[in-house]
Amino acid sequence: LEVAKAACSAGASYLGVATVDEGIELREAGMREPILILSQPPAEAIPLLLYYQIRPAVYTSEFAIAYAEAADAQGIKAPYHLAINSGMNRIGVRFNNVVEFLSQVSFHRALELEGCFTHFATADSLETLDFQIQINHFVEAMRAVEAAGINPGIVHCDNSAATYRFPKTNFDMVRLGIAMYGYQPAP
């Protein structure tokens, strides 16, 4: 909570969290900035996401539709950020399937694509080949989205290490983690 307050007082206009509970804690403490959960929460959390206005990462059509239907039933929008798998292979729509995924879920009027992002597996590694492959995959996905006439919203991918080491990949927003606590990301 204190880190979020300090970040916002220093100019941060968006907050990222790992869990729904962390997002709720920030809302209940009076934080008004948009809050993004950096992974897709379980469907059971959808009512809480809508009530507390917390944006989820989305990468399955089942979750996207359930989220949209719940929002539509309340007459509100369902803003989300699309998680793109560019090579970390934990979460996300595979980079070469992004446009297909968006076409499968975009019919729902409540869904509102607010951003697109990926997670880097090796931005803190001395060896940069895997990082370069990931960034190329992510850029390829963003070009495909734009070529399809879809506004990707806020484009973001940089963690602490990438923010410092690869400033050309900062795009619209960076997601500092360890650097916010005064630590230098490896190497």
Name each model-derived stretch:
Residues L1-I54, V58-Y67:
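N-terminal active-site wall of soluble small-molecule enzyme domains
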Residues L1-A10, A68-A71, K77-A78, S86-P187:
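Active-site loop/helix belt of alpha/beta enzymes
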